[in-house]
């Protein structure tokens, strides 16, 4: 009951934040690829989800900025795209289409084996990343890494248990304001999934300036807002992603987040 009430409050608050957010002109198409889709499948698939009712190309938001930096820096042959959290089915279809190299509508064991997928998101988008990983599990498709930033689940969702097709998962959260993220994620199978950590971002101690966000966000959801515009946090995530997209990925231990404020 308490969770249901909290979820309803989150919906109302996130809707207000979306209404208060300034509208931007369309950014560069988030579907721009670093490979020729007509010739070969991508070596890497990186998919992000924005939170609330944010547009996938609103460049003032952390996931969109991260995707653009990854596009500009990662190896050729990498597909990078951001989706609205409500477009999970569209993201799923994109992954299946990219993996289905023979275009027969069915993923073969070899096509699944070639999957090199990283998923990340903020708020409702973080929950969407976990749910997409779960969708891919039903197909037998592995996921390298999921990254949750201040993850907020909708009423019918479970963003706390990471499915066993995910190799590594990490969770960042804060506790300030009306909306705050899940404190802890766990692995459905600890043998197959390594939880890199549940990291508290203390914005009372180390505040982040977010001048482009609404007065409502500053007043009522300051921590949630800061988790989305925190350059240090998103740089850590970018480094984690880039390490795993290199030809010879570093070990899980070497790729853990750098000096988090606190670890659970």
Residue ranges with predicted function:
Residues 55-63, 88, 92, 121-129, ...:
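Solvent-exposed, acidic/flexible segments
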Residues 164-264:
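C-terminal catalytic-base region of ester-bond hydrolases, centering on the histidine
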Residues 2-10:
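Bacterial N-terminal signal peptides that target proteins for export
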Residues 66, 70, 95-187:
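Serine-dependent carboxylesterase/thioesterase catalytic core
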Residues 10-19:
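Bacterial N-terminal signal peptides
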Residues 35-115, 219:
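Active-site catalytic motif of lipid deacylating hydrolases and related acyltransferases
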Residues 25-30:
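Boundary at the C-terminal end of the N-terminal hydrophobic targeting segment
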């Amino acid at each position: 009951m308490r969770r249901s009430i909290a979820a309803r409050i989150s919906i109302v608050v996130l809707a207000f934040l979306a209404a208060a957010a300034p509208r931007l002109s369309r950014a560069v198409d988030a579907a721009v690829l670093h490979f020729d889709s007509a010739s070969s499948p991508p070596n890497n698939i990186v998919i992000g989800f924005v939170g609330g009712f944010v547009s996938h190309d609103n460049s003032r938001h952390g996931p969109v900025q991260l995707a653009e930096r990854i596009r500009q820096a990662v190896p050729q042959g990498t597909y990078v795209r951001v989706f609205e959290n409500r477009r999970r089915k569209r993201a799923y279809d994109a992954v299946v289409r990219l993996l289905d190299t023979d275009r027969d509508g069915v993923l073969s064991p070899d096509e699944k084996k070639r999957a090199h997928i990283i998923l990340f998101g903020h708020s409702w988008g973080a929950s969407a990343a976990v749910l997409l990983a779960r969708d891919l599990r039903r197909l037998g498709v592995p996921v390298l890494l999921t990254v949750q930033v201040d993850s907020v689940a909708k009423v019918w969702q479970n963003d706390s248990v990471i499915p066993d097709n995910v190799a590594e998962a990490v969770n960042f959260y804060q506790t300030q304001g009306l909306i705050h993220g899940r404190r802890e994620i766990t692995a459905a199978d600890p043998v197959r999934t390594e939880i890199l950590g549940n990291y508290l971002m203390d914005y009372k101690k180390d505040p982040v300036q977010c001048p482009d966000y609404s007065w409502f966000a500053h007043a009522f959801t300051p921590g949630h807002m800061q988790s989305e515009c925190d350059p240090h946090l998103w740089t850590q995530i970018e480094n984690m992603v880039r390490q795993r997209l290199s030809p010879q990925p570093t070990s899980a231990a070497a790729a853990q987040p750098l000096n988090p404020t606190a670890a659970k």
